[in-house]
């Protein structure tokens, strides 16, 4: 049946082509081959491209077919109109990297360019580029069709930094990214208003009001993604929504992006198993590394070291981003914690999931938030030296999850923006026989890219710090059973999860994978080599060598008689 449909489509296209194209332009044999082996949705589409999106060793001519000869196309990600280029015949697609830089030369994407700081540089060379062709046609009544687009990467086998990583092309109307009014990636009008009413010297540039600091659905923009796996095979083409992601890192470069699948964009799930876990998420994050912008490995390392612990961790996959056709850096694509994540990995129905993040309700009802506050107040203020109170706390919390989470964060020397922020926990609302539908709160690890796992904080007394910063942990620590269990688990982690050779091996593997991609990233945004990347890797290895002895001392110093 599938073959029959393809043959019908081929014959139909042949007739259309015969009518609308001259004999010199029309090559039936060529067209049939390309329709059969074109994009997986090409037979169903009204607009057909003679080449599927992807990677090509040599330049080629691209033909576009539609039910009308009024076909228009763009090369900058914008929607085609009658003001765009009209398709008059096959288009030569060559290595777009030879074209002049456009958006990569912008200085309105970060406040740093308005200061004397020299952290970021616009590229003084031609950055790598792909060709984005977005086409639409007009019928006899003047109605415009939905647009179709393809990303073409030509001569990339000669370019370094793309082996063994995935590629994602994101395209959207340029105004969605860089417009003064609606652009989510620029200082924009929000900054103009901020500058008129504030002394810029009174705060760091990354805290200045700017479009990219704005949040919420109104600052989400429709975009189109094309994802290519490590073999450079197209695995996903989908309309999505994009937003800037992060806290302070919104004011840095490059910026992280949240990517949303929604019914309004055509599908409420990503149609690709990004992490080979059978999970088709609604949301993912393209993470720039946050404050770990020189190394970009701390979040992944923290998650992979602790993936067998009794708390949630994310999966990470390496990507190079091309934004409206231009190279835009190295990223890790990660999951987002939400009810769909919990349903998939913990077999808890999404409507039964409650998630609290940084003390705020992420998933659930106001009654659920009240239940969280009641638990929090009890654990923080009840006398935990009374055994009955401690046992009550154990019915509210998954104590193994709590201990694993705090032990891991403390061993990693997490501080500064934790535990007062960057924490999350979840539970089921209703109780059942399922192991994770027991109504107990469990913890979620994320954002380990600030003050963690590096040698200049290997001697930090993180236990004393947490005893001051977390009322919940401090109160539980007054209980002898809790202290004994926590201390034993922390020492066990030192010899297993955080054992030196294990960390060194992981970091060495990251260096092998990320070395060339990070060279591209550092040249693109900092105008430097990636020496600092390897230095960051060395700092992690040094931390692995020395941290254990400090942890042992830390437990002794904070012992309770």
Predicted regions and their residues:
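Short, glycine-/Ser/Thr-/acidic-enriched flexible segments
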Residues: 69, 78, 98, 175, ...
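Conserved ATP-binding subdomain of kinase catalytic cores across diverse folds
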Residues: 170, 194-369
